[in-house]
A protein has these predicted regions:
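Active-site substrate-recognition loop segments, prototypically the cytochrome P450 B′-helix/B-C loop
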Residues: 46
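A general boundary/transition motif marking the beginning of the first structured unit of a protein
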Residues: 10-14, 38, 54, 87-90
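Alpha-helical ds-nucleic-acid-binding substructure associated with the helix-hairpin-helix region
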Residues: 19, 54-55, 59-131
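Intrinsically disordered, low-complexity, charged terminal extensions of DNA damage-control enzymes
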Residues: 1-37
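Structural motif
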Residues: 34-43, 90-93
Length: 135
């Protein structure tokens, strides 16, 4: 229900400030509900990194190939063979670096959704900002 309160707040604020066109648009669009990803946290962050600065179609194609590699991944640390698979999937050197920083990060691997939800906004920010490619 929080999304409905956010919608009402934005609508009321636009009216208060005299932004009638914006208020009408907010009213017309209605409340937006954000869906929570069902992916594990590491996969979710990996998909976000891959999708940065790409067209939707390119990101989807590269993610499909990368997701397959990740699901088959039995590696315990970064290595040349895995990096080559990522490169063949269409990832740049920099994105491979970022992806390795996520998939081999023990803190990310071990954290639960419950722990993430318990974090304050500042704690969550600090937790994510330390990760290369996000921070």
């Amino acid at each position: 229900m929080e999304y409905k309160l956010a919608h009402k707040f934005l609508y009321d604020k636009a009216v208060d400030k005299g932004y009638i066109q914006l208020a009408n648009h907010i009213k017309k669009v209605g409340p937006l509900k954000i869906k929570v990803s069902k992916m594990d946290f590491v996969s979710h962050l990996s998909k976000i990194i891959i999708g940065q600065q790409l067209s939707v179609q390119s990101a989807a194609a590269i993610w499909k190939r990368t997701d397959k590699i990740l699901k088959e991944n039995k590696y315990k640390k970064e290595n040349i063979k895995l990096n080559q698979k990522f490169k063949d999937a269409g990832l740049s050197r920099q994105k491979i670096e970022y992806l390795n920083g996520i998939i081999f990060n023990k803190d990310l691997i071990n954290i639960s959704k419950k722990e993430l939800k318990r974090m304050s906004a500042a704690e969550y920010f600090d937790f994510l900002i330390q990760i290369k490619g996000i921070g």
